[in-house]
Amino acid sequence: MLLSSALCLVTSPAVHAAAPQDTPDLAPLAPVPVQRQLDWHDRRFYAFIHFGPNTFTAVEWGGGQEDPEVFQPGEMDARQWVRAFKTAGMSGVVITAKHHDGFCLWPSAVTEHDVASSSWRGGEGDVLADLSKACAAEGLWLGVYLSPWDRHEACYGTGEAYDDHFVTQLTEVLTGYGPIKEVWFDGACGEGPNGKRQVYDWPRYIATVREHQPDAVIFSDAGPDVRWCGNERAIGGETNWATLRRDEISVGTSKTAELNRGHADGTHWVPAEFNTSIRPGWFWKAGLDDGVKSLDVLMETYRASVGRGGNFLLNIPPDDRGLITDTDVARLAALGEVLDATYGRCALAALAEGGGVVARASNVRGGEARFAASQVLDPGRDTFWAVDDDHDPEGPVRAWAEWDLASPVTFDEVWLGEPIQLGQRVERFRVLCRGPEGRWKPIGAGTTIGPARGLTVGEQTTTGLRVEILGSQAAPALSRVSLYLSPPRVAIEPAGAVAVSPVEVSLSTRPGAVTRYTLDGSEPTVDSPVAEGPVRVDRSLTLRARAFDGRGASPFPAEAIYRVLGPDDWKAATQFLVPPTPGLRARLYEGGWQTLDQMEGRAPLETRDAPGFDIGLATRAEQCAIAFEGFLNVPEDGLFTFATASDDGSRLFIDGDLVVENDGLHGMDRRAGKVALRAGFHALRVEWFNSRGGAGLQVRWAGPGVGAEVPIPADALFR
C-alpha cells in the first residue's frame, strides 16, 4: 500500500504533488531488461524436473544406447508433481524434455529413441503433453530443457545434418505444447555414437526459439537472456550484477566466477539463474531419502539465490513410479509454509497501512511525491524513491532515506530492490536502525542490490530504519524496502539423550512466543501444555515441540528422542571359566563393496590375530574389508559411548546389537552410539571396508572408568 504524500517528509526540496511533466523521469541506465526478462524476474522460484531412462538405470548421464523399454513410469501423474511444486510456492517448472542420452519425453517424428518406442501406455505416452495440461490446470508456467548433445543420434557430429535434426525436435516442442516460458540449453558437448563432437549452431537454435516462442527466455552459460550462476549449489555471489559482457562468454565457459558475480560494466542484461537439486544427484535414485535437503538448507539457498538478485531453480526428480516421493512432497509443503510465514507479511508495510510510518530522505527527485521515500513501501518496481541527478553526496553517503515508525517493529531480515526496468545502479549500501538511545546503529551492508537483495540482520526491534547508498553508477533509486520476521523456533536441550536416570529438558523460544509440547510423539496444538520450566523425562519417549506467537503455530517443528534405560536395558557381562587371550581376530576380505551388507555370507580370505583395530592387516589398499572380533573388558557398570571414525564405512556391534552405524562410501566421518553395560566382558565386532582412495579407522569409547572419549586401548581387547 502506498503512503499518502503527506506522510513523506524530506529535508530539501519539499515534496509536492507536481504534475509528472515538471520533473524529467529517471533516465534508464543501459543495459536494461526487455519485457520477457522482466517477466522472468517475477517468477523467482520454480521447479526443475530430471526424468527419463536415467530414472530407471540409476545413472546421471545415459549413454544413448538405452532400450526405450526401460522407461516404465507406471503410476506417472504430472498433476501430482505440479501440485507438490505449488505447495512450495513455485511459479512453474522446467523439464528435461531431452537429456544427453537423446531420449525424448514426447513422441518425436525424427527419432525412435523416445516414449513412443516404449510399451508404456501402449506407446501412446507423452510426458510433455501431461505436464503441459497439469501446469495449465494448476496455473503454473512450463519451460523445457533440450540438450543439444545427443549420444544416440547417428548424425550427431556431422554438422548441418544434426543441426537440422535438433531444430526439428526443438520446433516440435515449441509448437506442440502451448506457451513455453523458458528454454534451457545445457552447455555439455561430448562425443556422439560416431566418436565425433558437434559444433552447435547457436544462432539458428536461438532464432528458432524466437520464432515460435518469442516470450520465452533462453538460458545457457552465455544467455542470451539468462545465465548460469557458475555453481550447482544455487549460491549467488555477495556481489551479483545482472549485467554481463555477453560477447566475452561462450557456452561451456570456464569463467564460473564471472558468471557468479556478473560484470559491473556489462553490455547486456543477462541475470543469473541458480540451480541445485533437493536430493543427491539430478535424477532420482533409490535409497537416498536421507540426503534430501533440510528446511534450513533450502531456506539458506533461497536467501542466497533470490535474495541475491537471481531466480531459484530447484530440481525435484520423479521416482521410477513417475511420482514425486512422499519425502520430497512433505519437504516442499513444509518449505512453502516457511516461505509464507517468513515473507507473507512485511512488518513495515503493515505498520504503514495504519499511517504509522513517516518517510524522509536526503533528496527527492524534483521534490515530487511520485519519487518520495514512501514509495518503497509498495514492493512493486513501478513505484520507487529516486533523487535528482545532481544530488550532492554528504561525505561518503551518496543518498539516504529514513522511515520513522509510530510503534516498535521487530524483524530479522531486510530486503531491498531497485527499479530494474531502469537498470542496475547501486554499488554499495548499508542499513541502520534506531537503537534504544535514539542513535542509528548499522545492522547490515552489501554491494549490489538489483531486483532483490536480502540481508539477515539478527533480531532487531526499532522505531526507525535508515538506508544509505554509499556508491552508485548513476542517480540511485530504490523500489523496495521490506522488513520480515522469521518464524520462531524451539531450542531443545539436551536435543535427545540415552540416560540411566531421568533427564531435565529445557525448551526455549524467543520473547513474545510460547512453547507448547507433547510427550507422546503427537503434533503440539494450541491445547498442548506450555513449557514454563524444565520438562522432566523419566521414561523412553519422543518429545515434540512447536512455538506459537501472534501469527499462530510456527512452521518449524522441534523433536527429540529420549531413551531412559530400565533394568532390562542393561547388557550382562559374559563369564569365562578360563580368562580370554589378549587381542582380536581379524577376518580379511577382498571385494569392490559399497556397503558392509555385502560382507554377509562371504568367506574371509584368511583370519589373523591382531592386537587392535589395525587396518594395515588388509590384503590390499583398496577394495578390501576387515571384521575385527573379540571381547571388550568393561571396567565398571554404566552408560558407555562408542564411536567410529572411518573412510569408507564401519559398524560396531556389542553383544550382537548394532551400536554405531557408519556404513557407506564417505570420507573420514564419525558416528557414535550409546549402550548400558555391566562390568566384565562383552562380545565386540567392528566391521570396516574401503572402496577406493583414502582409508582410515578409529574406534573410541567413553564412560565410567574410562573418562572422556579415547581410543579403545589394546589392554581392553580379548579373544
Please give the residue ranges for each predicted region:
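Edge beta-strands of jelly-roll/beta-sandwich modules across compartments, strongly enriched
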Residues: Q473-S486, G693-R700
